[in-house]
Amino acid sequence: MTLAKHWKYGKDEDIVVTQLRGLVASNPYVNLIPSEKVVFNPHSDTSKKITIISGGGAGHEPMHGGFVGENLLDAAVSGSVFASPSTKQIMAAIKTKSNKEKGTIIVIKNYTGDILHFGLVAERAKSEGYKVELVIVSDDVAVGREQNKMVGRRGLAGTAFIHKILGSASATSPDVDLKSLSDLGHAINKNLVTLGASLDRTSVPGKLEEEIEFTGNDEMELGLGIHNEPGTKIKPIPNIDELIQKMYHQLLSPEDKDRHYVDFDFENDEYVLLINNIGGTSSFELYAIAEHALANLPLKRKPKRVYVSDFVTSFNSPGFSITLLNLSNLKKEDISFTDEDVLKFLDTPTNAPGWKPKIYDSEIWNSQNKEIESPMKNETLTSSDLKIDGQKFESQLVNALKVLLDEEPKITRYDTVVGDGDCGQTLADGANSILKALKEDDDFKSNLNDPVYTLGKITEYVEDSMGGTSGGLYSIFLTALVKQLKQTKEISVQSVGDALYHALYDGLFKYTRARVGGRTLIDTLQPFVDALHKTGDLTKAVEAANKGCEETKNLRASFGRASYVNEEEFKAEGGIPDPGAVGVLALIKGFTEKL
């Protein structure tokens, strides 16, 4: 039996304590009681404020220890992986930070073990003279009332909101009493809804793979719990918009009586949106998911705040959750705080490392129009008095691009072996953008007889559509070529050869050290330019380009990611030519065969 893939730790090591020590080592604002797994803020003056304590099983980091800090938690206690801490541990947290006069609020998620252990400690603490109130977070909508009627909704990412709101309220409202603050916590919880979606179960360090029922290919789970509790399996995996629409329906639809927990006025209600990384979703995808979540919101008003980060996780679970807090409903609650107070508490700065969103004031949040037009949009391209046969040039250009597209599968196959596999697609993106422009851009098509203007437009399309190193090289070379053509008095094979020569040697070579022999696109481009400049003979120039490309089969890469590939890979199939060199050769052959 093999272990799920994780780093290996000492056989007898308590990895929970180890990670808490790492947290404390990186955060000088907190201290640790390692024997009890309690992280606490020694700087918070609990003689003047109500103490906010939380805790639960490990594996949901940054919850709970990562939320200890100014204007957030005063202490957090961790159990073992996915297991509630003991009553002894919880009592240690209370005795470390609680003040008998001001009182303590304990925030926990709605799981049986947490309720039993924290509830028992709350009663024990009361018997010793402490004032203690429990706020139990239950924001999940995945499980309906009928199924959870004995235990209630699970606590998920909405817990982070309650931590932040109660922590800030306690720190900034020294005169608030314990009941008023706990009432705020209950009111927030009452108006929270959360639903998660995951591509797979989480892999727990030290747990055998055979003990985890992973999802199948092209399968996901909606409502998968943060302890691997089964959700509803969906196959095939839907498009992200379709998935998010389904999630919003489950979060908000009043038609689903079994799962409709919070009323929303779709036209008028104010709310806060939180997109939570359950652990294994990249930041890249998480922000993309957030944009789709915003685009598909069925609520008319924009959210008052948008938070995107990892708040409540489940190790490396490749999923996300959506949380909505209805602010407008708070006006109907019998509490001492307003919805504006709640936003103020969310905006209060904190040094807790787990609360990663930057803090902005209300004025900044209210300035919603964040997208502007590019200053490049209306730039006027340079035109010239040079003239060519525009119709013939278009025919040559289209042929060159089509030859390149025909070669794309081969280029991609070569680059998959000796590079990172993106060269073919990058070139295809550039080719397709130019072909599209020839159909849709009237200015481009009507000025094909002006080589300066035309190459300027082609450079624009290349810059916009081609990323990576090859995109940069093509863009610089074409920009330099435009500059040279502006200084040319007439178009001929020789004058174009001279312009290409100076664009290469005085332009592109200023920004790259790649030369013939380095196994790059230069191995095709440089021989072609040199031969055309020297002889003015297009046939000889094409032959030189072909020879240069062929010789890359025997070269070891010196530049780019290919320089890290084992030499044996280059010798496969009798030698693999450089993909970039093949691409340039395709363009040269395609363009010149129509002359």
Identify the function of each model-found stretch.
Residues M1-L595:
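N-terminal loops that bind phosphate or other acidic moieties
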